[in-house]
Amino acid sequence: MGALGRVLLWLQLCAMTRAAYKLWVPNTSFDTASNWNQNRTPCAGDAVQFPADKMVSVLVRDSHAISDMLLPLDGELVLASGAALSAAGGDSDPACNPGAPLLFRNPDRFSWLDPHLWSSGTQAPGLFSVDAERVPCSYDDVLFPRDGSFRVALGPGPNPVHVRSVSAVGQTFSRDEDLTAFLASREGRLRFHGSGALRVGSQACTDASGCVCGNAEMLPWICASLLQPLGGRCPQAACQDPLLPQGQCCDLCGAIVSLTHDPTFDLERYRARLLDLFLKQPQYQGLQVAVSKVLRDAHTEIQVVLVETEHATGAAGQLGHALLQDAVAQGSVLGIVSATLRQSGKPMTADSELNQSSSGAGLAGGVAALVLLALLGTVLLLLHRSGRLRWRRHEDAEPVSAGLPLGFRNPIFDAIVFKQQPSVELPDSAQKVDILDIDTKFGCFVNPLFAGEAEAEA
């Protein structure tokens, strides 16, 4: 094959291969203010300390005059061209605090799985990536600063991290054997640590419709790293019924358009169409759009996430409906087979927040009542089993003694209630009737208030 043929073949491979890059952002440079506990670089007369038990490689770019330096047990200071470290004289910078040493922050704080620490060099304005795709995907080329110092924690995910290649310290690793040897060397151990594993050699994405990122299993650890500064909790969405796109850690306000496609669909061309025909319109200026291929129910689809970055205005829903109409009108040209739309609810207002808090309070009250009832039942059961509390059936109760009177003694009258009366003779009959012989057993009592009158009449 001639030179021209090789050039044409290389151009064809470049066209077929849609290489994506992820750039590592943080560093362990001596001249980066965020690497020091006072958020400033050392000034003249400062005493500086490095963590004694941490391995770290630190690049020094400028010249510094310091009064004292405590170095780590295992590490290195790399002096760039023109850089120098010298002992400070008697004078110190008035802006410095000579009483407190300047401490180099923990270099192990940077995790591979933290989306904050990566940047995509191919991200156009108005576009963003869901959280799982902000970390290097399996088809990505990973770039670390060529002329900078860094340290990365691998893990703690369950599976090795797979990428296409890793470029670090002036070398590009695309074979596992070469990368493994580098990670085992002192130079590699100064820059990579942790329980996780890193693998290279994955294939680049050659599918015009896009490729699945491959970080679905790592998403819980990605979200843990992302939300660590927030205490592990997502901020509350500013709308009712928010949406959770696939690959995202927290709910969003906006809309999601799901597209099924045929082999003629081109992901990059569809992204460009969104930017040129829709996002440039004034009513959609405040929207952010993420377009990627995701795996759902063993099938792939194109997920278009529309997020309102400012106050909810309904623009995301409007754009979602516009994309549905565009899919109907131009679906055969774009390679779109079907499209569905999901939208979040209305913006959160004071009344809706009050209703949510009231319903939450009611639910909490109901749960608390159930817990109290369960505790009360448990206490009663324990008391019963210990013999301190007894209960009987109604039929097991002792019968009332038959000899006890059914009435009660009245202290005011202090008289016997039932008293035998003499026989009386009815005027219309010669028959005597004994009152005690009547079935009803009537009785009478002597009222002391009228006892005198009764005796007088007698």
Swiss-Prot record:
Tissue expression: Expressed in polarized epithelial cells which are specialized in resorption or transport, specifically kidney proximal tubules and intestinal epithelium.
Residue span of region Interaction with CUBN: 67-87
Residues of the signal peptide: 1-19
GO (cellular component) term, any one: endosome membrane
TM spans (from-to): 363-383
Residues carrying covalently attached carbohydrate according to the record: 27, 355
Extracellular topological domain residue ranges: 20-362
Protein function: Membrane-bound component of the endocytic receptor formed by AMN and CUBN. Required for normal CUBN glycosylation and trafficking to the cell surface. The complex formed by AMN and CUBN is required for efficient absorption of vitamin B12. Required for normal CUBN-mediated protein transport in the kidney.
Domain notes for this protein: The complex formed by AMN and CUBN is composed of a 400 Angstrom long stem and a globular crown region. The stem region is probably formed by AMN and the CUBN N-terminal region, including the EGF-like domains. The crown is probably formed by the CUBN CUB domains.
Extra facts: The role of Amn in embryonic development seems to be species specific. In mice, null mutations lead to embryonic lethality. Human mutations give rise to much milder symptoms.
Entry protein name: Protein amnionless
